[in-house]
A protein has these predicted regions:
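Post-Walker A helix-loop "phosphate-sensing" segment adjacent to the P-loop in P-loop NTPases
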Residues: 27-35
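ATP-dependent NMP and nucleoside kinases share a basic, alpha-helical "lid"
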Residues: 95-149
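NTP-dependent small-molecule kinase module
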Residues: 102-103, 165-194
Length: 194
């Protein structure tokens, strides 16, 4: 492992502000950051129809190929490039594409459940949890999923009620205890001081 590589994990609920925090960190470390998103490690479901895939629970640990992400993060820490899978939210499946990712001085690992897995968590030097009110997270998720992922308002609300909220309470919120830093209010206050 390269001791000169810093791995920062950013977790938090859906719509909490993880991407905003990540982008702020990237802007302060320009050219030195590699990002690896847990979303790209959703399991492949080529054997299912779109309708079947749209009914899956994407907010539980079993939805992810976290062992592949652990392997990829270990490779990056060793100084090796990886071919990261790409998940397509519009079809609820991985695409055939990959992203060539090279290690840099800082690796940011981002996702709702990255602190839930001990093996993955132990590869991180700093663990940041973005803590945001549930109503704000829901509003952000609706806006994002309708505008960027081609979902209907009804499908977003159903998914939130059926899986997102219960899985947040079961897995995401409890994983906050593994954070070194908890950023309140989605980082709104924190960025005023930096």
């Amino acid at each position: 492992m390269d001791d000169n590589i810093l791995v920062i994990g950013i977790a938090g609920g859906t719509g909490s502000g993880k991407t905003t925090l990540m982008n702020n960190l990237i802007s302060r470390c320009e050219g030195m950051v590699t990002v690896i998103s847990h979303d790209n490690y959703y399991k492949r479901h080529d054997d299912m129809t779109y309708e079947e895939r749209s009914q899956l629970n994407y907010d539980e640990p079993a939805a992810f190929d976290t062992s592949l992400m652990v392997y990829h993060l270990e490779e990056l820490r060793r100084g090796h490039a990886i071919e990261c899978p790409v998940y397509d939210f519009t079809i609820h499946n991985r695409s055939e594409q990959t992203i060539h990712i090279v290690p840099k001085k800082v690796i940011i690992v981002e996702g709702i459940l990255i602190f839930e897995n001990e093996e993955l968590r132990n590869l991180m030097d700093i663990r940041i949890f973005v803590d945001t009110d549930a109503d704000i997270r829901l509003c952000r998720r609706i806006k994002r999923d309708v505008n960027k992922r081609g979902r209907t308002l009804e499908s977003v609300l159903k998914q939130y009620q059926d899986t997102v909220k219960p899985m947040h309470e079961r897995y995401v919120e409890p994983s906050k205890k593994y954070a070194n830093i908890v950023v309140p209010e989605g980082g709104k206050i924190w960025w005023r001081w930096t």
